[in-house]
Swiss-Prot record:
Gene name of the record: rpl32
Region (Disordered): 1-21, 34-58
Lineage: superkingdom: Eukaryota
Bias type Low complexity, positions: 44-58
Alphabetically ordered keywords of this record: Chloroplast, Plastid, Ribonucleoprotein, Ribosomal protein
Record's subcellular location: Plastid, Chloroplast
Gene Ontology biological process terms in this record: translation
GO MF terms, alphabetically ordered: structural constituent of ribosome
Protein name: Large ribosomal subunit protein bL32c
Family: Belongs to the bacterial ribosomal protein bL32 family.
Cellular component terms (Gene Ontology): chloroplast; large ribosomal subunit
InterPro entries per the UniProt record, alphabetical: Ribosomal_bL32
Source organism of this protein record: Cyanidioschyzon merolae (strain NIES-3377 / 10D)
């Protein structure tokens, strides 16, 4: 005879969800930091690089 399974308590469900959200937020912060670093790096590199059309002929 089939027996229904017990329900997971709400506190356990919420605890797992909050843990998952914490991990997701941490990954989001890491990604944003990395994107900011790369953007800043691109900003620093652009003025120093000369385009072929900007070079002065000798």
């Amino acid at each position: 005879m089939a027996v229904p399974k017990k329900r997971t308590p709400k506190s356990k469900t919420r605890s797992r969800k909050s843990q998952w959200m914490r991990k997701a937020l941490k990954q989001l912060q890491k990604a944003r930091t990395l994107a900011g670093r790369l953007a800043a790096r691109q900003d620093q590199m652009q003025p120093t690089q000369m385009q072929p059309t900007q070079m002065q002929p000798n």
